[in-house]
Structure formats: C-alpha cells, structure tokens
C-alpha cells in the first residue's frame, strides 16, 4: 500500500515539478515519468529522456475528473456519466483539449489523453501535487520499468524517483476516443 509522501518529500517534489523537473512514480502497471502538464521544460525533458517523438502526445492523470477539467473542453452531464462509468480505473479517454493545452502535451492531436487512476499511490500523489503527466518510464519502444531501483539506474539524477509499488495490471491502460467510442489500445 502506498503511503502519503512525508511533508518534506512532498515539498521537495512540488518544488522540483515547478522548476520543470520530472518525477518517476509507481502506477497501475509500471513506473511512470511525470511532470506538470503545463510546464514546457518538464515536457521537453520527458520527451528527451524517452526518445519519444513530440507528435504523439502524453497522458495526464488526476485523482478525480474535476482536477482534469481545466485541460479539456466542457463535457455535458451524459458525457460525464460515461466517463464515471469507467473511472477511477485503467481507462484513458481522448477528450477535446482546451485551447491552452501545450502542443508538447497533446502532440499533433486536438484531443488530450486523460485518466482518473484507481491506483492508490497515483491518487495520493495527484491529490498532493495536482494532475501529472503519466507516460511509461522507459525508452520509447522498450520494456517499461517496474521499480524505483530500475528508474534510478536508467535515469540517474535526471528524475526524482519516488517510492512506491506498481499495481497488478499487466498491460497499460486502455485508450478510448471519447467522441467515437473507438478503442485505440
């Protein structure tokens, strides 16, 4: 079970994120790399660390949909009910992105991938730090890292590695285009 970060570590993580830093943290199936969704420096660092093309876009996780609303266009009551039928859980939805969302975050798309995670550690982390980018901690196309030690070995001092255990999921979250209902992953 994930315990809340001690106050000093929480303050350090918050300052690190605000300065454009990147965190490595446990998620449902692997460790993820994250930064603040509106921080271009952090987004560029993640893309560089992973060797990920900037046209692909990244996922943002939050503790609840209310935390993610400023990043997407308004969703009506029926749409919110659809989201809540799958959240919290391992489903990522592509929603129309707010016009202020950085292209580095959404890639070449007009949508943004968002998820309300059921992983207790992610929920606690986003409660304390706000919504975070969540992309697998790995080099693009390679195996995802499963623990903090592997993240330290791979990324060294370039990321702040937080303690935590991954969930039991063996696969990454499903990705569903909200408008069409099409399952993309």
UniProtKB/Swiss-Prot annotation:
The keyword Nucleotide-binding applies. Its EC number is 2.7.7.87. The keyword Transferase applies. Residues 7-185 form the YrdC-like domain. Keywords: ATP-binding, Cytoplasm, Nucleotide-binding, Nucleotidyltransferase, Transferase, tRNA processing. One of its GO terms (biological process) is regulation of translational fidelity. Coiled coil: none annotated. GO terms for cellular component: cytoplasm. Pfam families: Sua5_yciO_yrdC. It is an enzyme of class 2 (transferase). InterPro entries: DHBP_synth_RibB-like_a/b_dom (IPR017945), Sua5-like_dom (IPR006070), TC-AMP_synthase (IPR023535), TC-AMP_synthase_SUA5 (IPR050156). It catalyses: L-threonine + hydrogencarbonate + ATP = L-threonylcarbamoyladenylate + diphosphate + H2O. Signal peptide: none annotated. It is found in: Cytoplasm. GO terms for molecular function: ATP binding; double-stranded RNA binding; L-threonylcarbamoyladenylate synthase; tRNA binding. Required for the formation of a threonylcarbamoyl group on adenosine at position 37 (t(6)A37) in tRNAs that read codons beginning with adenine. Catalyzes the conversion of L-threonine, HCO(3)(-)/CO(2) and ATP to give threonylcarbamoyl-AMP (TC-AMP) as the acyladenylate intermediate, with the release of diphosphate. Belongs to the SUA5 family. TsaC subfamily. This is Threonylcarbamoyl-AMP synthase. It comes from Laribacter hongkongensis (strain HLHK9).
């Amino acid at each position: 079970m994930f315990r809340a970060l001690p106050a000093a570590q929480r303050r350090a993580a918050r300052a690190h994120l605000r300065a454009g830093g990147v965190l490595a943290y446990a998620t449902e199936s692997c460790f993820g790399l994250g930064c603040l969704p509106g921080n271009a420096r952090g987004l560029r660092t993640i893309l560089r660390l992973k060797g990920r093309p900037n046209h692909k876009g990244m996922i943002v996780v939050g503790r609840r949909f209310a935390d993610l609303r400023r990043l997407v266009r308004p969703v009506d009551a029926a749409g919110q009910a659809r989201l809540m039928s799958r959240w919290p859980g391992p489903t990522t939805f592509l929603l129309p992105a707010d016009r202020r969302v950085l292209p580095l975050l959404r890639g070449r798309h007009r949508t943004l991938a968002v998820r309300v995670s059921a992983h207790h550690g992610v929920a606690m982390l986003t409660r304390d730090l706000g919504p975070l980018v969540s992309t697998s901690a790995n080099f693009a196309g390679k195996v995802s890292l499963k623990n903090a030690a592997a993240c330290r070995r791979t990324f060294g001092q370039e990321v702040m590695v937080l303690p935590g255990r991954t969930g039991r999921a063996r696969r990454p979250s499903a990705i569903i285009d909200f408008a069409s209902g099409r399952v993309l992953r």
